[in-house]
Amino acid sequence: MKCLKTLLVSTTLLTAFSLNAEVTLEQQVKITEEGLHFDGRNLDFSNVGTPDTGEKYDYFFGPNISAHGDAVKTYRHYVFMTWYKGGKNERNVMLSRYNTLNGELSTIEFPHKHTGFRGDPLVGESHNTIGLSVSPINGTIHMVFDMHAYDNNNHGGKFKDDFFRYSFSVAGAAELPHSEFTLDKFVKDTSEVSQGDDDYKHLTMTGDLDDKGNFARLTYPKFFTTVDGTLLLYMRLGGNNNGAYVFNRYDAETESWSTFTKFNENNQKLKGNQYNWGLYGNMKYVNGKLRVGFQQRSNDNSDKYKYQNGVYYAYSDHPDGFGDWKNHKGEPMTWPLINSDEIKVFEPGDYISHTEANSVYIVGSFDWTVTEKGDIHIISKVRSTDRGRADYEEVYIHSYKPAGAEEFIISTDFPGASEIYTSGDNVYIVGLEGGRPYVEKAQGGTNNFIRVYEASDGPVFDHGTLYIKDGKVYYYLMERTSGTAMPLYLQIIDLDLESDANAPIVSFPSPSVTVNQGYEKLSLNISAESPVEGRSIQSVSLYIDDELVRTDDSLPFLFGHGSKPHETGALGWLDRHEPNPSPLSAGRHVFKAVAVDSEGDSSTATMILNVNSNAPIVSFPQESLEVDEGFERLSLNISAESAVEGRTIESVSLYIDGGLVRTDTSLPYLFGHASKPHETGAMGWLDTHSPNPSPLAAGSYEFTAVATDNEGEETTASMLLVVKGEPEPPIVTWPNSTVTVYEGYEKLAITIDAETPVEGRDIQSVTLFRNGELVRVDTRPVWNFGHSFAPYEFGAMGWLDRHEPNPSPLGVGTHTFTAVARDSAGLESETDMALIVLSLPGPSVMINEGDISLLTEYQNLAITAEASAADDDISLVSLALYIDEQLIREIYEPPFIWGSDAYSTELLSLTEGTHLVRVVATDSNNKQSESSIFINIDLLGDLNKDSIVDKADTRLFTSKLRAGEIMDIRYDFNGDGVVNNRDTRGLVRRCTYSRCSSN
């Protein structure tokens, strides 16, 4: 056992702040000699097709796969660890259990072997980690492993029905005796997609194959345990610049998992956002809540960020994260999130000066945590993309928000780290230095890290991953040796949280205070007491921005009182107070109180003082502006006003890259107006303007406005002007900007045209995206997609005998395909094609007759129709005749005739009035179409259309006869073959009322 007891002095606090800590290495145990490690070349897309076939194990992304990811967890007195077995030809998934009480080690070997990068076992992939958890409620073991955004179709279909890998044990397996801790305690897959009798991998976590779409395209499994023992799993859905975090929940009572729920939407552009984006960070369950912290990678390749930008943070007040999501200020956010700006904390890219496209590199050294009392800590790093540039910059950032504070404190006084952890109210940096573990500690809500543990002997480690539980670090490490099989160790390090419980309790009256510049008084009564009976507070020291103000050794611990008015930065408020010669300037200041008790234990509290400026308020119309080289006009109306009543603005001066342009002493403060068109670098735009002899050339320029008020106070504002020269990116085009197909289409192959207009350059790649999701990167011409070896790329079903039907064809709607061409200079162009998938049309059907008019007592009526299917592969099932929504008869083969032959009377019962006739055709796809006509049945004898036959009709009948109008032969009531006056008696007999002749 190794113990290092230290008393260290923080460089930021000089000699005033010390921290006692006794951190001990409790146990170290070797888990195996055979942890899989990739010892070969780091491949890329140019050589991944030719990996080493010998002993060396080439890899993609990184060399680590064992002791990597979510690979170590605890359950009661056991520590569980996952790993892959080395060497190169083994690769089995392994699970080890260490009994911390008796030192017993149990290991299970699973049949599954690491499948390698995109299914090539000769190329290792570091992203295919094994996530691990044990339910504290029922003792089931859960593992999700060996996947990187796979689905049924990508990578040539290599992962069909095997794109998600989940293994789980029976209840109670976690604490079985050593002899019973065996593979048979895990549940086999007996579903229809099982790969055999030794298949312990399940395609879904719900047990329902109908849910398999919910488990596709996932990466980076990580489990959490909530305060009530519920297991949660989170993973990343999708790709690097178009992704989402998803999570699900385990119900220990029913031993079942839910489907995945999204924290944020992917394909954000389709949902109204300006661009698609992915997440680089973590979802964590800390301090009793599910939380998310990440950096964003957008698909904008023309901004100053090479990959990621920003720091984003959110948390959920729902016990399991299913709703009630908020930003760090407690404001509700859209859930699932679409616009990441709703939860943005700050921009690390603002901490270096580069502005050119792809010049800022924010990758790695990002992590975050939250202490038990609610202090939020986020670490990040920003540097120049080009390490060789003369003005190379690199900044490590620690942003933290003490519990109760309203805003983050952003500190660049931070040496940097890759991960940050928490236990109790402290934050920790745990890592390797010279291959040996060390621990640094800071009180939550502070930036005061000191080293409390470091190993000076023992094995030299290559890397590791860790889990902290109940004040102990379970550090799972791989020893640095050689080959494709290297030893794995577990170290258990006690963080000595018990001593922290004895530390003093210290606090400011408020976590944050806002005052105006020139404030006269700020008195702070700092509360400090010991939680341990018999101890007393020896002193309280106040620091402002890490500078010691004073140490007070007696109650009350009051700073800024009448005898010391200046120590809190105030001017003074009594007549006897001389004005403070060094008052606090406008801006944010960190006040820190350090309490030390009679045993030498100490604690720290912080307060943020925001000092509002009295200086003028000045601003450009916008912070940055892009124009094309040779721009004709740039007029800038600079806003300037005093923040103090009674003061006025004396002048506003404009500078370009430090050179004075002009000082304006009267409103409006307008530069680049018609009388001075050249002063902002423009060419001029009026006929009276001669061309600018010295226009601003392509490049970036800093415009600075300096506003001065009548008291001589100044304020500066800046604007970045980017003058864009003519870029010459590749030219990429589709054969057609819009393609229309019918659902179920078998084939769609398209060759994309890509070329560079610049001599000496060539096209390096053409990348195809479907609705924002990566389809494939093609690195050699011709740029053909959807060909016979990749028939599904445009969503087609497949057309050759060897093509299995596409299980995920594109549905009805409009789909956007984006082609991105990249040339040898790194310039990119993109163009979109709209693929419109139409619903298969129903059959065509037509009633041959037009609208029909009949009289009651009609004797004959037949209706005929013709129909055909929309496609040769579709058959016609039936035609059905409806009259007034009443089915008359359905006919299953032509001829389609109603009212003839054996059915001659089926249409003879229509009553007086108008009837809707519909013929509905149905095809073998259950698609339907219809044709319709109207049949109008008039009352026989009702010549004036008043719905009765009466004397008026007989008179009209006689009148029509006299006028020689042709009458319907059905009015030949006496059957002599003509309609004449002798038929009047027959009409009278049809009168609606009796005694028609007397009406």
Curated annotation (Swiss-Prot):
ATP-binding found in the keyword field: no
Gene Ontology MF term list: lyase activity; metal ion binding
Annotated Ca(2+) 2 binding sites: D300, D303, Y305
Signal peptide: 1-21
GO biological process, one term: polysaccharide catabolic process
Organism of origin: Alteromonas sp. (strain LOR)
Protein name: Ulvan lyase, long isoform
Binding site for Ca(2+) 1: D189, D199, K201
Protein EC: 4.2.2.-
UniProt keyword Metal-binding, yes or no: yes
Role noted for this protein: Ulvan lyase involved in ulvan degradation. Ulvan is the main polysaccharide component of the Ulvales (green seaweed) cell wall. It is composed of disaccharide building blocks comprising 3-sulfated rhamnose (Rha3S) linked to D-glucuronic acid (GlcA), L-iduronic acid (IduA), or D-xylose (Xyl). Ulvan lyase catalyzes preferentially the endolytic cleavage of the glycosidic bond between Rha3S and the uronic acid GlcA, but not IduA, producing oligosaccharides that have unsaturated 4-deoxy-L-threo-hex-4-enopyranosiduronic acid (deltaUA) at the non-reducing end.
Keywords, alphabetical: Calcium, Lyase, Metal-binding, Signal
Family: Belongs to the polysaccharide lyase 24 family.
Disulfide links within the chain: none
Site (Neutralizes the sugar carboxylate group at subsite +1): R236
Binding residues for substrate: S126, H127, Y280, R297, Y361
List of catalytic residues: H127 (proton donor/acceptor)
